[in-house]
Amino acid sequence: EMKGKLDGMAIRVPTPNVSLVDLVVDLKKDATPEEINLAVKKEAEGRLKGIVFYCEEELVSIDFQSSPYSAIFDAPLTNVIEGRMAKVIAWYDNEWGFSNRLCELFSFIADVARPNYLQDLVYGQTKSEHRC
């Protein structure tokens, strides 16, 4: 379904840990860079808060080192050609951002799989001793 509608690349830049994603998409309807940026900003401040950061500053790759975000959306670089061909750029620290997501994943798994695991370790309680 997405064949021929999505193209992009990731580029290693000359910093120890920072990379960028160059994403080009063919939109279903016309959009302006401002509309795309507004949509990303809304999500970055909403359900993707802490994962995606919306950035309007003109920064360079080293500025994103040690960022805890999975992606830093570079709003000034958003471009649209003929209304439907959109290009967006996002930066990421491929070690620190990834590590933060792993910590969140492990925390989630621990809470879902064994919500009282830490309590078991600290207090030595067995499953039958837990109260709802």
Annotated model-derived regions:
Residues 1-86:
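C-terminal substrate-binding/catalytic lobe of Rossmann-fold NAD(P)-dependent oxidoreductases
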Residues 68-132:
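NAD(P)-dependent Rossmann-like dehydrogenase/reductase catalytic/cofactor-binding core
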